[in-house]
Amino acid sequence: MTSIMRTRVSRAWTALLACLSVLALVALTAGCGSARSYGRTQLTVWSWEPSMPQLVKGFEHDNPDVHITLVTNARYEELNSAIQDGYGMPDIMQLEYFALPQYAVSGQIRNLTTRTDGYEAFYTPGSWASVGMDGNVYGLPMDSGPMAFFYNDTVFKQAGVDASKIRTWQDYYDAARKLKTIGVNITSDAGEASFFDAMVWLAGGKPFTTSRDGHDVGIDLLGDAGTQEFARFWQRMVDEDLIDTSTTMWSDAWKKAVGDGTIASVFAGAWMPSLLLADVPGTAGLWRVASMPTPNGNATNAENGGSALSVLTSSRKPDASWRFIDYVCHSRTGIDTRVKGGAFPADVATLDSPEFLSRTTVTDSHGVQVPYFGGQQFNRVLSEAAKHVSTQYQYLPFEVYARSDFRSTVGKAYTWANNWQRYRMEYQRMLAGKTGNARNPQSPGLMVTIEDGLSQWQQNLREYGINQGFTVTDN
C-alpha cells in the first residue's frame, strides 16, 4: 500500500471515529435528559411549596454546577413506597413538622447538626424545636404556622360580639352562644387531627413522649391534663350544637359557609391569609385577625402546620443538597421569595422587619394587593403569635399513621353528633306534621363522645407502635 493510500485510509478512520464520538456524546446527553444538564450535579426535590419553581430557577442561576428536577405531586405515601422499594427516593424532601420525627427516628433523613452551628437564633423557637430530636437537627425550617384567630368581624358585630376582646375559652363559648341566636356557627370541625393536636398543644398538653434514642414511646391521651381539658371544652361545644360538625375544612361546602357567614371564624395557622383570599375572595375587607383564646387567657400558643426541607440519607449528593436547602430556608433571597409567594416565615428577622409588620394587604394569584383584613396590620398579630409558641409538645415517631387513624376513632364522635342533630331535626319535623311520615326517624345509635374516641385512638396507637418495634407505655 502506497503512502498516499495509507494517508487516505488513516484520514477516513479519523473522520469515522470523530463521527462516532459525536454520536456517542449526543446519545449520552440525551440519556441525561438535556444538553443543559450534562455534566452537572443532579438533584431531585419533592416539594409542594408554590414558590419552589421560582426558588429552583434562582438557585440554578447562582449555582450553575447543579441541576434540579422538581416533583410537586409526591407526598408521604410515595416517599414510603420508595423507601420500602429501596429506590426512587428524592435527595431532598419537604416534610411537615409533624411528619419529620417519623423519618428522623427511622434513619431516613440526615443529621444536619454539624452544618447548623449558630442557626438556632435565626429561627423562631417553635420552628427550630420542630426540626430537632434529641439535640440533633434533621432539617431547616421553611415556614411556620403559629395559631391565630381569624374571624368575620361583620358577622360577630351582628351578634353583638367584639371578637377582638375574646381572650379565654369561656369568652369564646359565650360568643358562640350569641352567634347561634342569629343562626351562625362560630366555627366548624368535622374531626381534624391537625386541629385537635394544635389545640391540645395550646392547652399545654403533652400526650406523647419519645425517649432520646427513639425506641420508647409514651401515649397518654386519657390522663394528660391538657388533652382532657380541651376534650371537655370541645365536647361542650359539640353537645350544645355551637360548631358545625358536618362541614369538612377546605371542602366546597366549607368555602360556601365561610363566604356567606354561616361559619364565622377559623382557628388556623398563620399561613391562612393567602388561602382565605384564594378560597373566599368575596369576603375581602370583612375579616380580622386576633391572638388565640386560651384556657385562662395566658399568652401561650401552638403551631398548626409549617414544614422543613430535609436531606434523605439515601442521597449520594449531601453537599449539593445542603446548599439547596440552605438557599431556600436560610438565605435572604430564598426567604423573601417564599414570603412574597404567601408563605409565613420561620425566621426572626423577617417577623421583626418593619416592612413585614406594616403590611395591610394580601397578594392574590395575579399579584394584586387586596386589603382582606380591612386595613389591619395583621402580621403584627401573627408575628407576636409566633413568639409565644411553647416548645414542649412532641409528635409521635409514627405521627403520619396517627393522624390517618384519627378520623376512624375520635372522628366518630363528630359523626355521631352530626347524626344526632339530624335525628332531632327530623323528629321535630315529624311531630309538627311536616314529614308526611308517622314513623320515627332513624336513630343515631349509641352516643359516641370525644373521650370514647380518644380511648380507641390510644388503643390503636399502642398496638401500631408495638407492631412497628417500639416499646409503648401508657404514661
Where do the PLM segments sit?
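Extracytoplasmic/periplasmic solute-binding protein
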Residues: 138-142, 147, 170-220, 226, ...
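A structural signal for short loop-to-beta-strand junctions that line the ligand-binding cleft
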Residues: 81-84, 90-91, 120-155, 185, ...
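Glycine-centered hinge/linker elements that transmit conformational signals in sensory
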Residues: 176, 216-248, 288, 292
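Conserved C-terminal helix/tail region of periplasmic/extracytoplasmic solute-binding proteins
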Residues: 380-475
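Hinge/lid segment of periplasmic solute-binding proteins
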Residues: 97-147, 199, 288-290, 381
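Extracytoplasmic "Venus flytrap"/periplasmic binding protein-like
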Residues: 58-123, 157-160, 255-257, 261-265
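Short, solvent-exposed loop/beta-turn-alpha elements that line the ligand-binding surface or hinge
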Residues: 113-125, 165, 187, 206-229, ...
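C-terminal lobe and pocket-closing loops
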Residues: 272-283, 297-303, 311-409, 472-474
